[in-house]
Regions:
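Membrane-interfacial helix termini and adjacent extracytoplasmic/periplasmic loops
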Residues: 5, 10-34, 90-141, 211-212, ...
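Hydrophobic alpha-helical elements at and bordering transmembrane segments
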Residues: 33, 37, 41, 74-80, ...
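Transmembrane helix-loop junction
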Residues: 63-64, 95, 99, 103, ...
Length: 231
C-alpha cells in the first residue's frame, strides 16, 4: 500500500506504460523501465538455473555422502564464499572471468548454436565477455553459498530414525534421499531458493561491473550488454 501511494504521482504522469516502454529519454520526459526489468528478471533466472542444481548437489554431498572428516572444512569453505564482498565478485568477473568466458564459452557456443532456430538467437552476436549471460553466471556463483547453506541445514533436520528405518528395509542412499530427505525438507528447500532469488534480484555492484550497463533491448541475445534495476 505504501509503495502504491508513493508511486501514484509517477503513475498519474507517465501511466503504467512505464513498465513496458524501453525508451529512456530524460530531456523529453520519456521514461521506460522495460530494459532494467528485463535485465533483472533474466539474470536472476539464469542465476537460479545454474545455482539451484549445484547447491542441491553440494548440500546432498555434505549431509549424505561426504566422509566425516571432510564435512566441516568443506562446509566452512562454502560459507566463507558468502562473506566475499560483491565488489570483489564484480571485479573478478570483469577482469578475469569475462575474457575467459568470451573465448572459451561464448565464441564456441555461438558458433554451434548459430544455425539452430529460436535457440540460436539467444547465443548470437559478438562475444564481448560481459553481458546478460555473464552477469547471470556471476550471480549464480554469488548465491550458491546461500542456497547450499540453507539446504544443508534443512537436510540435517531430517530425523535420523526415519533414515535408519529406510536403510533397515534395504533402501539405497539415493532412495533415502529421494523418498525420505526431500519430501521431509521440501519447504525448507523452497525457502533457500527464494533466499537466493532475493539475493540475485537485489545485487548491485557485481552486476554493475559485468552486465554492460547499456540501455537497449534490440536483440534477444544473452551475449548483449544490458541493464538491471539495481545497477
Amino acid at each position: 500500500v505504501s509503495l502504491i501511494i508513493s508511486s501514484w504521482p509517477s503513475i498519474q504522469k507517465f501511466g503504467l506504460a512505464f513498465l513496458w516502454t524501453k525508451e529512456w529519454d530524460a530531456p523529453n520526459d520519456i521514461y521506460g523501465a522495460l530494459v532494467p526489468i528485463y535485465g533483472t528478471l533474466v539474470t536472476s533466472f539464469i542465476a537460479l538455473l545454474i545455482a539451484v542444481p549445484v547447491s542441491f548437489g553440494i548440500a546432498l554431498f555434505l549431509t549424505e555422502l561426504a566422509p566425516g572428516w571432510l564435512k566441516r572444512p568443506l562446509g566452512i569453505a562454502i560459507e566463507l564464499l558468502a562473506a566475499i564482498p560483491s565488489i570483489v565478485y564484480g571485479m573478478w568477473g570483469l577482469f578475469i572471468f569475462a575474457p575467459l568466458f568470451a573465448v572459451y564459452f561464448q565464441e564456441p557456443v555461438g558458433n554451434i548454436m548459430s544455425n539452430i532456430p529460436i535457440v540460436g538467437a539467444l547465443f548470437s552476436g559478438p562475444a564481448f565477455g560481459i553481458g546478460i549471460l555473464a552477469a547471470g553466471v556471476i550471480l549464480a556463483i554469488m548465491i550458491i553459498p546461500y542456497i547450499a547453506a540453507v539446504m544443508r541445514d534443512v537436510f540435517e533436520q531430517t530425523p535420523v530414525m526415519m533414515k535408519e528405518s529406510a536403510y533397515g528395509i534395504g533402501c539405497t542412499t539415493w532412495e533415502v534421499i529421494w523418498r525420505i530427505v526431500l519430501p521431509f525438507t521440501k519447504n525448507g528447500v523452497i525457502g533457500g531458493i527464494m533466499l537466493g532469488l532475493g539475493r540475485a534480484l537485489g545485487e548491485t555492484m557485481a552486476v554493475t561491473f559485468i552486465i554492460g550497463n547499456t540501455y537497449q533491448l534490440d536483440s534477444a541475445s544473452l551475449y548483449m550488454p544490458g541493464n538491471s534495476i539495481t545497477s
